[in-house]
Amino acid sequence: NILLEYKQIGPQFYTFGNPYMTNNIREFTIKDRLSLLERRLMFVVGYSSKDNNLSEIVLNPLKTKTFMLNSTLVPGPGAPSIVFNMQVIGKNNGIDSVEVDSLGQFLKDNREDSRALNTLFSINIPGSIGPISNTIALNFNSITYKDVIETDEKYADKPRRDDYLFQKSDTRTISANLSSRFPFPLRTVISFNKTQIFIPMMDENLNVIKDEIGWTSGGLSGSYSLKNNTIRINSGMDYMTNGNTDDSVQILGFKIGADWDLLRNLVFSLKSNVRFNRIKSNENDGIDNDNNGKIDGKSEIWSTSNSGTVISLNYRF
């Protein structure tokens, strides 16, 4: 299957139906899908070119070119399924020189010729342990950026200055989920996620370093049904932290709720949640964080971030 698409939205176009729609854009896309093994293995190869050069008032229009490869393997019921996606995204604003003042002194470097590599790998593994049906989902996503001007030989006569900082952050995410269905009306989900952001920075010696910011989270949620699924009780807890140092933050949350089908299309819902923050540095920061008249102490480590209860009555037409 081959898809050819051309889209152009002028700078004067606005819509209230979709306020997030981007105007002043022109895009050409071509995709080809190939299926093998009786449609159990599919590949999608595509290319798109996008720019915002539709108006004379646009200075230094940005051109984006994307090459993509998506592959999916679904052998059949009860077998693991695998997804692998890859995108190479290039951006160029057409600027080929740096800005200088009237005396020829350097002002700034607005050139952009960057390349991003976005990869996604996902595998879903179904299985059973006795009467319990389980599905394990593993995901890995990585986005890395490269400054072409810094590495390509065609820019050798106009290289970057030593104090230039390429301000694009790499990211990496790993997640895992275990979904279980029991022989009685109970379903549970155990989740784990770790996200790392590598922010480029420059030290006092003009060496580029990357500062890592990472968040790790885990959660457990479950639902139980009563009276032929007319009453559904939900509960869960989650935990998130950015490390184990004195400056780190831990967030612990709990939730509970229920849905009750009063009539055929009338549903009564009750949901409640509470979230706590643990900030160890509050113990010795010289500030009365909990407003109890005492400066510093064990009681200032934990605090309630938010809590609430929502009661609603919904009718489905």
Please place each PLM-identified region on the residue numbering.
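Exposed, low-structure sequence patches enriched in small/polar residues
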Residues: 1-284, 290-294, 300-317
